[in-house]
């Protein structure tokens, strides 16, 4: 099929769908269905359970590609609304859903003590960021603000692509860690930077990208969303919604840095906490190559933001359904400055690494234990754990989680305590309530439906005839 035929087919999708008179309940049904696929709060409960159970390369595919089909569906439905008044309502709903999903995902991510569960909740947070972009784009389109609409949708589309680069890299890294140590528990890992230097370096690039630090790709897409939110405030249209989303996006960014500083520091820095971790070795070349390939995309988007935005503006034009002055947007001072800043930072980092290597050349580097404030016999048990690293956030957000602890208590009569253990876990309180309610609802529906299972063929023929009669009636009334 020719390229132009694909464009015609894409345009025809909107033409044939009955969205011209779509109602709010129908819109909510579409958003709920696609939102469940994307991991939208509170329908995200399946995602943190699926990623730890799946092999790491499957988790990379699920997070990088599969959940994006839900985002694609939401984008299609929003684009199909055209210029009707419901578009503004859809924008507000998407903006609110994105804020709640992003905050919920990142707070729960920062509390996790398992590498893959942390990355899974981070995927929920990134879906929230994408929905913030789509929401502000819908508000800009509804109010006629071309800049806000284009910045929001370009940022959302680019962040969708960016997440498909850095999240598979991180999941591949988690697979390397699991293969080398046979665990993904943060409280069992540590010091892997010495044993797995290439994995540590590539994983560091992925954490910097997901934290939206320049000169990497996450910075560019979130910059576009920020520009749309700032312009939405400055233009006076939907000021309150834009300001609230801007505040939430900044808060999300701060907690992301906390979560991934905890992840990288606990896993790769410090000392090994177990014998298996101390005996870990670097992954083979194929596994390293699997991490390096997404890094190429991360660097390309970060260092060439104008080219990356050019790749998504065609889709942005399709969303806007009106001719967009993409050339002026690509040449905007903010985006050009982002490119210059990225190259400047890359040059500074390269220069510092070169100076460090040159200054240390030929010198003996002494290694010793971390200074313990006068204590001369520190051990690996005295390091920060994943639990202690995020204790401050846990004390603030304790109502969001269902905490559990299992261990053996220390008797008061035991003057010199022996070996004891205590395991702490954090579960998603709202997610567990929602899943319990959903399972109970399905159980009751199934119990009622099972009454129709009589085992008599004449009853089943009657059901089929009744269904056909219902379809005929709805067709006559022009309801389907």
Positions of PLM-derived features:
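Hydrophobic membrane-spanning alpha-helices of multi-pass integral membrane proteins
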Residues: 98, 206, 287-301, 317-325, ...
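Hydrophobic alpha-helical membrane-insertion segments
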Residues: 203-215, 290-309, 399, 468-470
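Hydrophobic transmembrane alpha-helices and their helix-loop junctions in integral membrane proteins
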Residues: 1-282
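Polynucleotide-recognition surfaces of large bacterial nucleic-acid defense/processing enzymes
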Residues: 241-254, 279-298, 302, 310-311, ...
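Aromatic-capped, Gly/Pro-kinked transmembrane alpha-helices
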Residues: 305-342, 356-480
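Hydrophobic alpha-helical membrane-embedded segments
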Residues: 167, 254-260, 346-363, 402-406
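Hydrophobic alpha-helical transmembrane segments of multi-pass integral membrane proteins
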Residues: 31, 204, 256, 292-300, ...
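Select subsegments of transmembrane alpha-helices in polytopic membrane proteins
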Residues: 61-67, 123, 287-294, 458-463
């Amino acid at each position: 099929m020719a390229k132009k035929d694909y464009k015609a087919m894409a345009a025809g999708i909107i033409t044939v769908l009955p969205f011209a008179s779509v109602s709010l309940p129908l819109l909510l049904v579409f958003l709920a269905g696609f939102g469940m696929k994307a991991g939208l709060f509170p329908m995200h409960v399946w995602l943190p359970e699926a990623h730890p159970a799946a092999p790491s390369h499957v988790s990379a595919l699920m997070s990088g590609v599969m959940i994006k089909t839900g985002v694609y569906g939401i984008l299609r439905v929003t684009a199909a609304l055209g210029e009707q008044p419901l578009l503004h309502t859809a924008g507000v709903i998407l903006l609110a859903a994105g804020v709640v999903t992003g905050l919920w995902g990142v707070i729960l991510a920062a509390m996790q003590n398992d590498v893959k569960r942390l990355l899974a909740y981070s995927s929920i947070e990134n879906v929230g960021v994408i929905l913030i972009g789509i929401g502000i784009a819908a508000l800009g389109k509804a109010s006629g603000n071309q800049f806000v609409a284009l910045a929001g949708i370009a940022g959302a589309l680019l962040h969708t692509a960016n997440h498909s680069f850095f999240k598979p890299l991180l999941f591949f890294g988690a697979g390397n860690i699991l293969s080398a140590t046979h665990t993904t528990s943060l409280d069992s890992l540590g010091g892997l930077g010495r044993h797995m230097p290439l994995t540590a370096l590539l994983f560091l690039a992925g954490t910097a990208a997901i934290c939206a630090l320049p000169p990497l790709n996450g910075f560019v897409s979130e910059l576009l969303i920020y520009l749309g939110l700032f312009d939405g405030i400055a233009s006076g249209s939907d000021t309150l919604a834009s300001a609230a989303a801007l505040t939430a996006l900044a808060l999300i960014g701060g907690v992301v840095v906390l979560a991934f500083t905890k992840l990288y520091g606990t896993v790769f820095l410090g000392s090994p906490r177990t014998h298996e971790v101390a005996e870990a070795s670097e992954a083979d070349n194929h596994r390293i190559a699997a991490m390096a390939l997404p890094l190429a995309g991360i660097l390309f988007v970060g260092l060439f933001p104008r080219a990356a935005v050019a790749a998504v503006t065609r889709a942005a034009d399709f969303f806007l359904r009106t001719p967009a002055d993409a050339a002026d947007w690509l040449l905007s001072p903010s985006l050009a400055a982002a490119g210059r800043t990225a190259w400047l930072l890359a040059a500074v980092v390269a220069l510092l690494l070169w100076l460090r290597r040159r200054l240390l050349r030929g010198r003996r580097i002494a290694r010793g234990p971390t200074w313990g404030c006068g204590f001369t016999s520190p051990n690996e048990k005295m390091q920060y754990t994943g639990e202690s690293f995020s204790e401050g956030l846990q004390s603030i957000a304790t109502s969001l989680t269902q905490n559990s602890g299992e261990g053996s208590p220390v008797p008061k009569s035991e003057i010199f305590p022996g070996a004891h253990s205590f395991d702490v876990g954090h579960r998603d309180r709202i997610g567990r309530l929602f899943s319990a309610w959903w399972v109970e609802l399905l159980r009751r529906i199934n119990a009622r439906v099972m009454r129709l299972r009589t085992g008599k063929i004449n009853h089943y023929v009657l059901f089929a005839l009744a269904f056909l009669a219902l379809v005929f009636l709805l067709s006559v009334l022009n309801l389907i």
